[in-house]
């Protein structure tokens, strides 16, 4: 409950930032955080530096042997956010700020800072080795590219579109380079069970059967079953006991919407969906206003940030180290219709 109240507090704080110059300053600070987390993540993924940077995922649990538990050496980016999934969510939000600021801000120094930060975050996101990182990052680039293409038709200025296209190509180059060097691999299932069994010590070591079904639908089925058994009020925030009794293998579904339904129930789920729809409507108006130069690039940035977070949330979970960024961005969306200072 305190966590939820804290999130709404961050949302309210975002709503109070009604001056565009202050939104830009806040964006500078947020992008700086993203660049820092990206640098830490990259260092965690480099064998020579990984041993000196704290990381819960330096070694991944792989099973049991006669000598006890066995682990494999891995080099996975988490930043200082505890898990690769949290890093994926945070960098999705912040990359949207960095890319839009790089495209549309008037100051050259800020453009350069955002461009460097974006490159770092792109590399770190890929090195997180999980689906939501690739999905969220890809959404940021694709959505921003579409907006830039439409904007260029309104403003007759092709520079932002060309810059976004170049950024998209550079991101593709970074991905190709990491893939070619065998530094890119998706390790979602191993990371999920290592996080649950080894880091948090709350559930088992893996699936309870031999199915080859992709891990996400497998977990979603468990989550929906639990939600159906506790449809109105949910299980509450600590749903481990309910999950254990129902025979599920883990206490999280790795789908933020299913997690919300199973833990908070149908009423809170419906209210949250209404809130998200209202926010998306405001986002559409912000982007439309940006096309006609009625508001600055921060409106476009926060809209892209919220939308891309919602996309990657289908394969991610809420976390105290990542969700605050979403709520701040959502508050900034609503700030455009608040009383302007």
Locations of regions flagged by a protein language model:
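Membrane-water interface of transmembrane alpha-helices in multipass transporters/channels
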Residues: 319-324
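Conserved glycosyltransferase catalytic-site signature
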Residues: 29, 132, 216-217, 254-255
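Luminal/periplasmic active-site loops of membrane-embedded glycosylation enzymes
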Residues: 57-74, 92, 194-214, 338
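Alpha-helical transmembrane segments of multi-pass inner-membrane proteins
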Residues: 1-13, 21-180, 263-301, 306-313, ...
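Extracytoplasmic/periplasmic ligand-binding sensor domains
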Residues: 26, 182-195
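TM-adjacent membrane-interface loops and short helices in multi-pass inner/ER membrane proteins
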Residues: 186-190, 198-250, 257, 264-271
